[in-house]
């Protein structure tokens, strides 16, 4: 059983939901990212998504776009991120998911990327611009190496798309709660709750909800109906204001509060 599957199974046994946290790898630098991964885990994160910075992040709002720019300016590359994962994997067993765009993976070479990612200790990959209809080659390579491939569903996904993602994906399914780009929002769309119910009729994989969740109350509301919640932009926003120990402490405190919000709802 993969680290991702094991984590969700263990949480289910404890009647808990998953807190999935997102930060951009290399913002402000890769050395800091390694320390923050350990801080996120210590503070209550159950899974961690590492954003792979890209020069044309079409699905991302301004907060994560700026974070990607800072990481790219610091010299962050996909090979360096894999080296980071290999280093941090010696210190933790928390599931690590690379989230980004297909172009850097394609340029790296699909077979080579998958092999190197698994060797480094990556558990899953989510490529936001690789739809299931075009993912056959990547999915086949990932399946051979035991790498989970995570796909997105959105409020506009019809029943056929839901079935396709349910059949093709592994690890978990990521439901994007709003149309548009990433970014913290002041409330959770009411449509999330019936949408999640509809998706659950067709999927057996864990279902996590992200995009726009920005505080413990929102996280708790969504966790009440999903298997997990993803918080990204609200965390990445802290990187604009803080550095060093203060960034680590602020990030840790916020994640602890988010986890408390998620745990408050139970299973």
Curated annotation (Swiss-Prot):
Gene3D superfamilies: Aldolase class I. Its EC number is 4.2.1.20. Transmembrane segments: none annotated. Belongs to the TrpA family. The active site is at 49 (proton acceptor), 60 (proton acceptor). The alpha subunit is responsible for the aldol cleavage of indoleglycerol phosphate to indole and glyceraldehyde 3-phosphate. The gene is trpA. It holds the Pfam family Trp_syntA. Keywords: Amino-acid biosynthesis, Aromatic amino acid biosynthesis, Lyase, Tryptophan biosynthesis. It catalyses: (1S,2R)-1-C-(indol-3-yl)glycerol 3-phosphate + L-serine = D-glyceraldehyde 3-phosphate + L-tryptophan + H2O. PROSITE patterns: TRP_SYNTHASE_ALPHA (PS00167). Pathway: Amino-acid biosynthesis; L-tryptophan biosynthesis; L-tryptophan from chorismate: step 5/5. CDD domains: Tryptophan_synthase_alpha (cd04724). This is Tryptophan synthase alpha chain. It is an enzyme of class 4 (lyase).
């Amino acid at each position: 059983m993969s680290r991702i599957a094991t984590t969700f199974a263990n949480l289910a046994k404890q009647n808990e939901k998953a807190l999935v946290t997102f930060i951009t790898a290399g913002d402000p630098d890769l050395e800091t990212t390694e320390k923050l991964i350990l801080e996120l885990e210590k503070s209550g994160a159950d899974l961690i998504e590492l954003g792979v910075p890209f020069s044309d992040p079409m699905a991302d709002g301004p907060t994560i776009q700026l974070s990607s720019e800072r990481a790219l300016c610091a010299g962050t590359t996909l090979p360096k991120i894999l080296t980071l994962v290999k280093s941090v994997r010696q210190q933790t067993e928390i599931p690590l998911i690379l989230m980004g765009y297909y172009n850097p993976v394609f340029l790296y070479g699909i077979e080579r990327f998958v092999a190197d990612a698994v060797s480094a200790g990556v558990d899953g990959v989510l490529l936001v611009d690789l739809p299931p209809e075009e993912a056959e080659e990547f999915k086949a390579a990932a399946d051979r190496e035991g790498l989970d491939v995570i796909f997105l569903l959105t409020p506009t996904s019809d029943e056929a798309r839901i079935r396709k993602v349910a059949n093709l994906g592994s690890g978990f399914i990521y439901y994007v709660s709003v149309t548009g780009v990433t970014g913290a929002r002041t409330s959770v769309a009411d449509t999330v709750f019936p949408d999640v119910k509809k998706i659950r009729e067709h999927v057996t994989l864990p279902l996590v909800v992200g995009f726009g969740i920005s505080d413990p109350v929102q996280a708790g509301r969504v966790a009440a109906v999903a298997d997990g919640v993803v918080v990204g932009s609200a965390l990445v926003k802290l990187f604009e204001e803080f550095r060093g120990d203060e960034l680590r402490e602020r990030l840790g405190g916020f994640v602890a509060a988010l986890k408390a919000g998620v745990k408050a709802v139970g299973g």
